[in-house]
Every structure is written in C-alpha cells, then in structure tokens.
Design a protein with these regions (language model features):
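A residue-level marker of the well-folded mature domains of exported/periplasmic proteins
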Residues: 2-5, 26-270
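Sec-dependent N-terminal signal peptides of Gram-positive bacterial secreted proteins and lipoproteins
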Residues: 6-27
Length: 270
C-alpha cells in the first residue's frame, strides 16, 4: 500500500509540474510571480487513511521539488463527504490564490461547478483517486486525472487468493468443489471498486477456482464499516463463508478485526 500511495503521489507531482508549465506558458506571469507555487488539495473526507497518507506523500514529493527559484506551498481542505461543501472549499482555495488544484471528488459525477470556477480563473485541475466521467474531463484542456491501476490490483488479489486456495484444499470446508465467498466493496459506482471486484473474481476463475457468491456488502472503504458488515455476513452465513475478499486494506483490517472475535477456519482473501 505504501508503494501504491507513493506511485500515485509521484504521478500527481509530475502532473502538477506539467500543468504549471502549461500555465506559465499561457499566462504571461512574471518570473517573480512564479517563485511561489500554491497548490490546493481538497479531499472527499479527512477520515480515509489511504487518502490522508497519499496527501502526506504528495506534500513530501512537492517539498522535494523545491529549489532556490521556487517555493511550493501546499494547502489542504476536506469536503467532509459533502459535494456542496467541497465546492465551497474549492472556491476558498481559488480566492486564496492557488495556482493548481488537486481534487479528490466527493461525487465523481458532479465536478461541473468546480470545473467552471477553475476555468474562469484559468487554474488547472488535477482530479485524483475518483475519476470524473469522460465527458466532464473533456470540457477543458487543463483538466487531468491521476489514479491507480484498479484492474492490476484486482488481478493481483485474485492471483494471491487462487495460489492459496489451490495449495490448501481444506479451504473448501464443505467439500463441494466450490468456494463460497463474500465480498466487501468500497463504494457503489466507484470505478476502482468495480474494476477490483471484476478482475479479482475473473482471475480466480481463470486459475480454475470455482466460486459461489454468497453476498456482498458496501463498506465505503472504511475499517469500522467493514467490521459491521462482516458481523452481518457472519450472522447470516456463519462458517459457510470460505473466502472473504475486500477492495482495500482498510476494509480487510476491519474484516480481520471482526473475524478475530470469532475465529473462523479457512482462508480469507485480500
């Protein structure tokens, strides 16, 4: 996970650099004005450990980009899971004189007001982690998106689970030749959750693992919610669950915390 955060942060910082070059080339700003680069980072929440870690890594990457000619100031705000509030925070960042905006949308389908505000002030916007729909990204040439390779993450998850299952036949506790599984999904409609789920399951099937889906629960990428959802699943299916998959580490930790309270034989997959 640390490598994943670092990779996204590096891509973000590189994209910021590219956006600044475009901005400098088109704006006619003086060298004196450009000595300080103000970057505004607005996340969807302040309660997501992955996003918080990613923000910290981005700050470190940008700090490393500073030199005698340029100082970089990073300001951060949270939308607190409310798109209207996030829009207001973006407006505050624009009024404060930010040169570049990095935005982790609350609602990936509702970036229009943010795009309009930024475009009016000619401020590049880099969306990250939650990708706007293509039609929105095509509204303006100074809109960018940086995110993880969710397909690859799903494939890797499926490969790890398949390797364990194929070498541990005892996972199939009821000996029916199928693996009964439940799934903790990150968020309804989130492109990463959709891809990770799809490709983890496809990869297991390609590895000759026959699956039977018992249920899934949305846990919003959150450890506490995952623990609560696992409580429901265990209450309903008990030891009939042979495999648990989750879309991110936080939900996996919540799942483990719940399972630790009531030990279940068999393997749970990450």
């Amino acid at each position: 996970m640390n490598k994943k955060k670092r990779r996204v942060a590096v891509l973000l910082s590189a994209t910021i650099g590219s956006a600044v070059l475009v901005l400098s080339g088109c704006s006619g700003k003086s060298d004196q004005t450009e000595k300080t680069l103000r970057v505004g980072v607005i996340t969807y929440t302040q309660d997501d450990p992955f996003i918080n870690g990613l923000t910290d890594e981005l700050k470190a990457q940008l700090k490393a980009m500073e030199n005698k000619e340029r100082r970089i100031i990073v300001s951060t705000k949270s939308g607190n899971d409310d798109q209207q509030e996030q829009n207001e925070k973006v407006e505050e960042m624009i009024d404060a004189g930010c040169d570049v905006l990095c935005i982790n949308l609350v609602d990936r389908t509702a970036p229009s007001r943010i795009i309009r505000m930024a475009r009016n002030e000619d401020i590049p916007v880099i969306f990250f982690n939650r990708e706007p729909v293509r039609e929105d990204l095509m509204q303006w040439e100074k809109l960018y998106y940086v995110g993880c390779d969710a397909e690859q993450s799903g494939i890797m998850q499926g490969e790890i689970a398949a390797e364990y299952i194929n070498s541990h036949p005892e996972v199939d506790k009821n000996k029916d030749g199928k693996i009964q599984y439940v799934l903790l999904e990150g968020e309804a409609g989130h492109q990463d959750a959709i891809s990770r789920t799809e490709y983890s399951v496809k990869t297991l099937m390609k590895k000759d693992v026959i699956l039977e889906k018992l249920s899934y629960q949305l846990a919003d990428w959150n450890r506490g919610q995952a623990e609560n959802r696992m409580n429901r699943l265990i209450s309903q299916y008990g030891k009939g669950i042979e495999l648990v998959m989750s879309n991110n580490d936080e939900m996996a930790l919540g799942r483990w915390r719940r399972i630790g309270k009531q030990a279940m034989p068999g393997k749970t997959g990450r």
